[in-house]
Amino acid sequence: MSEKNTGRVTIPTNLDVVPETIELMKRWGADAIRDCDGTEFPEELTKTGAKIYATYYTTRKDNEWAKANPDEVQQCYIMSGFYTAVESELQIPLMKGISDELMQVNTRDDIKRWWEVVDRSTGQVVSTKQWEYNEESGCVCIHEAEPFHEYTVSFLAYIIWDPVHMYNAVTNDWKDFEHQITFDVRQPKTHKYSMERLRKFCEEHPYVNVIRYTTFFHQFTLMFDELKREKYVDWYGYSASVSPYILEQFEKEMGYKFRPEYIIDQGYYNNQYRVPGKEYKDFQAFQRREVAKLAKEMVDITHECGKEAMMFLGDHWIGTEPFMEEFATIGLDAVVGSVGNGSTLRLISDIEGVKYTEGRFLPYFFPDTFHEGGDPVKEAKENWVTARRAILRKPIDRIGYGGYLKLALDFPEFLDYVESVCNEFRELYENAKGTTPYCVKKVAVLNSWGKIRSWGCHMVHHALYQKQNYSYAGIIEALSGAPFDVKFISFDDILKDKDILKDIDVIINVGDGDTAHTGGAVWENAVISAAIREFVYRGGGFIGVGEPAGHQYQGHYLQLADLIGVEKETGFTLNYDKYNWEEHKNHFIPVSYTHLTLPTNREV
């Protein structure tokens, strides 16, 4: 293999596959080796001349410390189920539907201060004098409840089994292992200990070139039920980034009292379809500042020890949003992330302020794919072809794979296919890197989140679609490989300076009405609707998908009905007769829709 056709590839390894690792390094042209969760790095491979990544867990893999400091174990806000009172006394079980291997109710801190019982029929907070918690039964007992009102309890729970470790253990059917407890690096004792622990790790691993942080401090929201099935997931969720220690800091800095409801949000947990309120946005900004400061401490130690600092974009990544200003202050050398499609590739490749970016391609070498009868080649093809067009728009600098290499060795056709992928990637990179791709227009995706959700719009879980949002996410996916200069803006951006629209050719507003993706009640602000109308009046384009600007207000459901020439019938206008049923079947839109085969990211 020529020198030009080697490099830019990272390969996983383990103690039991040393010769095979060396062979595949040659075949795939790999110039970096990594360990993974559940594997160990072989000493024999330290002399290969390859760059060595060490996966480093800032918040787990040290149960001795976690058990000795239970007060500094990480916590999560959870809302109980909805329960209807039929008399004045009501018992609400807190952990019903939640794995007790994953979470443990926190009674160490003042529950009357940090918990909240809410009458969901009125939205009012129930006085702390009207309820208490019975630790033995695991229930909150509400007194003087209003019959036939619904109630919930918002409470803090310790994360006693790291959710990612739990997922890996369940997926791989691990036996005879200890549950890894998630400790909180933000808190004083663990903060001090973690810096010493990191320095010691660097000193004891002189052969390691890159510390691959997986990740920093707070896991995205991931909960499992009693059967260890995924119950709730939000790849952008902040509900597992809380503790009384953190919340007291927030109160001191922001000047107002924190409510659990700022996180709980009626049980929606401020997922990306919810229009974020001021308090939640304040909390996000606070977390980004604090996480960036602490992450910088670790990166500085890494650099002092002569190593590079790489961050995995996922798992405990909350607070490190790479498109926000705070990210650049961390000082990372690189970012690596999982590539599930074109959107998630751009989520990595569009990151600025690092020396290089890397995409971990699928499938991950786990038994859920690599088993008798499994078809890893099919998954690898779909993954590569889906991401390929996005690479041509904005390439990542490296690719790699992860998991148990031993499993992949039983699939020779897969090994052959990955070899072809590595060669093709290097060829694409050599031709695309440093060039400016052709752009037809400048496009802005407009929603309530803006740049903080760049390339992640409509992504509930990483690169996974739901039937309800598949078409919306598909718009973002199409943009990832299309000839447009794409940016993501928020309604707040327009309110701050509507001149931001002068540099844009087309605005896209995509999603269901009354969600964060279309704006909801923000359309009651005439500044917004007037700015968009003026933009179109002066020659700009507006594309709405789903229920653009959808919100019932002042005689319209679609607030730009005059602009887009269509209104949604909600029943409110059935009294108006309609006579214009003329169809223009030869118009370019229906003609294109019927006959045109659009290019997709799935062309093989």
Which role does the model predict for each range below?
Residues 38-75, 227-235, 298-301:
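Aromatic-lined substrate-binding rim segments of carbohydrate-active enzymes
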Residues 70-329, 347, 433:
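Polysaccharide-binding and catalytic clefts of secreted carbohydrate-active enzymes
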Residues 45, 63-66, 198-199, 209-216, ...:
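Hydrophobic targeting/anchoring helices
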Residues 594-603:
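Conserved small/polar residues in nucleotide/adenosyl-binding loops
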Residues 17-44, 48, 200-212, 387, ...:
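Catalytic domains of carbohydrate-active enzymes, especially glycoside hydrolases
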Residues 7-12, 32, 174-191, 276-291, ...:
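The substrate-binding groove and active-site-proximal loops of carbohydrate-active enzymes
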Residues 514, 518-593:
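A glycine-rich, often tryptophan-bearing local segment used as a flexible ligand/cofactor-contacting loop or short
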Residues 10-22, 37-38, 311-319, 478-498:
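A short, well-structured beta->alpha microelement
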